[in-house]
């Protein structure tokens, strides 16, 4: 099946290229860029030399439609909203890595993203692409809104608790830490090496755009869920996310019950690995893979559950989950083309 990538020179784009070039069923028909049209991808990123030869093309929907069946949009917020209706109109399936179609309510999108929302008709058509929790909807979708990286790690950690109804709806606290690639390719003072090396920075306190995305998904499983407390930090690693989730249970529980809850929730999910009781993962243990590893603890003294969730923000948090969703759309096994062992060193 032929695919196209728009926004091929960003970090999400080059991770899509790396994965798709090794995929046994998908092949790259074309790569598209806004700023580097006419350049060979190997001139922009020499690590692709002798692996693929593609010239970066301008975005011509009619030409893309002739060559591809699925389009991956690795474009900034706002750009996808403009392009997607045109791509859908010619019968292409779209997997969007931006936040433009994650929110069903355009007012909420505009409130958090500070820009105009996509057309409501297209928003209604979009399916939120959290693969493990939306499989049946993704199978039939023409437009998939790939989840945000923080949202992916957080939702995979909290949804078993929310679905089971065992936690207080107003008790969810999420502490999230990300490597610098999550901030994208465009440099800023905060991501500048001297600013972040040997340092730790909190940002977007109570204002991160993944907050409404998480709350929207939680409300699908429990309408009583209240607003969450969510903080995000940059740490001096290139890729990886660690989310530490806290929630208060409604009644006394045993850690064995919580462990069983998670093991049963994800027993059919090849990319979710639940650690043994008392063990907790680190981002290094999933780097370069599509895995989400989790460890669970319970504090009898406070009645709080702690869940630690780690992913590679470029893989399960972006390109890896996008291809997992493409596999579902194409009727393939979810794991095809994504069976990479983590790169520990």
From Swiss-Prot:
Gene3D superfamilies: Dihydrodipicolinate Reductase, domain 2 (3.30.360.10), NAD(P)-binding Rossmann-like Domain (3.40.50.720). GO terms for cellular component: cytoplasm. Its EC number is 1.2.1.38. SMART domains: Semialdhyde_dh. One of its GO terms (molecular function) is NAD binding. It catalyses: N-acetyl-L-glutamate 5-semialdehyde + phosphate + NADP(+) = N-acetyl-L-glutamyl 5-phosphate + NADPH + H(+). Pfam families: Semialdhyde_dh, Semialdhyde_dhC_1. The active site is at residue 149. The keyword Oxidoreductase applies. Keywords: Amino-acid biosynthesis, Arginine biosynthesis, Cytoplasm, NADP, Oxidoreductase. InterPro entries: AGPR_AS, AGPR_type-1, NAD(P)-bd_dom_sf, NAGSA_dehydrogenase, Semialdehyde_DH_NAD-bd. GO terms for biological process: L-arginine biosynthetic process. The keyword Hydrolase does not apply. Pathway: Amino-acid biosynthesis; L-arginine biosynthesis; N(2)-acetyl-L-ornithine from L-glutamate: step 3/4. It is found in: Cytoplasm. PANTHER family: N-ACETYL-GAMMA-GLUTAMYL-PHOSPHATE REDUCTASE, CHLOROPLASTIC-RELATED, N-ACETYL-GAMMA-GLUTAMYL-PHOSPHATE REDUCTASE, CHLOROPLASTIC-RELATED-RELATED. Catalyzes the NADPH-dependent reduction of N-acetyl-5-glutamyl phosphate to yield N-acetyl-L-glutamate 5-semialdehyde. Belongs to the NAGSA dehydrogenase family. Type 1 subfamily. This is N-acetyl-gamma-glutamyl-phosphate reductase.
């Amino acid at each position: 099946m032929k695919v196209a990538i728009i926004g091929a020179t960003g970090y999400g784009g080059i991770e899509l290229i790396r994965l798709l070039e090794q995929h046994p069923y998908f092949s790259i028909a074309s790569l598209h860029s806004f700023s580097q049209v006419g350049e060979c991808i190997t001139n922009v990123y020499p690590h692709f030399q002798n692996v693929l030869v593609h010239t970066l093309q301008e975005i011509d929907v009619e030409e893309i439609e002739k060559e591809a069946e699925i389009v991956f949009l690795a474009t900034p917020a706002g750009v996808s909203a403009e392009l997607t209706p045109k791509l859908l109109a010619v019968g292409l399936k779209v997997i969007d890595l931006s936040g433009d179609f994650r929110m069903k309510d355009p007012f909420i999108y505009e409130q958090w993203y500070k820009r105009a929302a996509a057309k409501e008709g297209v928003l209604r058509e979009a399916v939120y692409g959290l693969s493990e929790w939306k499989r049946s909807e993704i199978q039939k979708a023409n437009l998939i809104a790939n989840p945000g990286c923080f949202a992916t790690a957080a939702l995979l950690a909290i949804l078993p608790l929310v679905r089971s109804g065992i936690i207080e709806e107003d008790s969810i606290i999420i502490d999230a830490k990300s490597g610098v690639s999550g901030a994208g390719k465009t440099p800023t003072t905060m991501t500048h090496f001297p600013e972040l090396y040997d340092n730790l920075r909190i940002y977007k306190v109570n204002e991160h755009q993944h907050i409404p995305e998480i709350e929207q998904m939680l409300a699908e499983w429990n309408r009583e869920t209240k607003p969450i407390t969510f903080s995000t930090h940059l740490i001096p690693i290139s890729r990886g996310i660690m989310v530490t989730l806290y929630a208060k249970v409604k009644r006394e529980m045993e850690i064995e019950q919580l462990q069983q809850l998670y093991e049963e929730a994800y027993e059919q999910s090849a990319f979710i690995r639940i650690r043994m009781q008392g063990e907790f993962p680190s981002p290094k243990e999933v780097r370069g893979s599509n895995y989400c590893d989790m460890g669970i603890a319970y504090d009898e003294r406070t009645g709080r559950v702690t869940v630690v969730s780690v992913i590679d923000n470029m893989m399960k948090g972006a390109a890896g989950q996008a291809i997992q969703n493409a596999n579902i759309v194409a009727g393939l096994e979810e794991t095809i083309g994504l069976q990479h062992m983590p790169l520990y060193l």
